[in-house]
Amino acid sequence: MRKIIVGSRKSKLALTQTNWFIDQLKALGLPYEFEVKEIVTKGDVILDVTLSKVGGKGLFVKEIEHALLTKEIDMAVHSMKDMPAVLPEGLMIGCTPKRVDPRDAFISKSGASYKELAEGAILGTSSLRRSAQLLAARPDLQVKWIRGNIDTRLRKLKEEDYDAIILATAGLQRMGWDNEVITEHLDETLCVPAVGQGALAIECREDDKDLLQLLAHINDAVTEKTVAAERVFLHKLEGGCQVPIAGYATITENDAIELTALVGSMDGSVLLKETVVGTDPEKVGLEAADRLIKQGAKELILAANKGQQ
């Protein structure tokens, strides 16, 4: 019986996601056993600055990918939104399980909704994507950066001077906390989700054919297709955490992919947005990127990157 070593970050959410996925594999009843290896990533250690200032995408995966390449682990369970657009040679996303709720969750101290927040209220987020879109709709709000895992951020909301914070609904759902803490879900038209938000990425070595066959049982074709379009868009624009960038795709009634893509200025004063419909994930992602580039997306990205230096 083969033992599969599964790499995971140490946070409660990461381990919850990893153990959930292992349970899906165990339920297949095939002759494998599983062991979780906890790995500390750079993003877990550096908590005193915003994600955009310490390298953006890849912060939560590089050490885990190193363990995959050196064969310390056989596969890793990541949040898809943490994945860089390009993976190291020899590694691949071997499986995308069914996506859960991709929306952002608004959590306020008083129970007030986003629209009801008092003028000048303090909103906690570590995401340029969230802050740009929410400032575009409510320029009167003050954004204050907040870092840490889910439990830390919820504690900071209670104890510090934040009036509200924004978290991914998916993480709260996976922890079983969504019903008790979420004030409201932010509609995708108000705040377009991050590329891959709500989806998991199961990363493994390209040459591990045995494991890839096992993972194929859990793969969700719709999630794979929609996330692929989002990630092609992200790759074309070379956008990481250093710029407000968003992309969310769904499948239409006619089985086409509909991708809404967005790039914004840091302060939310400019939001470029396009919706593209097509059948091929790569073509849809590239088309969305090209349309935004024509609107001036590259200039916004350059300006954002200069602002981070």
UniProtKB/Swiss-Prot annotation:
The enzyme's E.C. designation: 2.5.1.61
Free-text cofactor note: Binds 1 dipyrromethane group covalently.
GO biological process, one term: protoporphyrinogen IX biosynthetic process
Pathway this chain belongs to: Porphyrin-containing compound metabolism; protoporphyrin-IX biosynthesis; coproporphyrinogen-III from 5-aminolevulinate: step 2/4
Record's keyword annotation contains Transferase: yes
Alphabetized Pfam families for the sequence: Porphobil_deam, Porphobil_deamC
Cofactor: dipyrromethane
Catalytic activity: 4 porphobilinogen + H2O = hydroxymethylbilane + 4 NH4(+)
Sections of the chain in a coiled coil: none
S-(dipyrrolylmethanemethyl)cysteine, modified sites: 241
Cellular component terms per the entry's GO annotation: cytoplasm
Name recorded for this polypeptide: Porphobilinogen deaminase
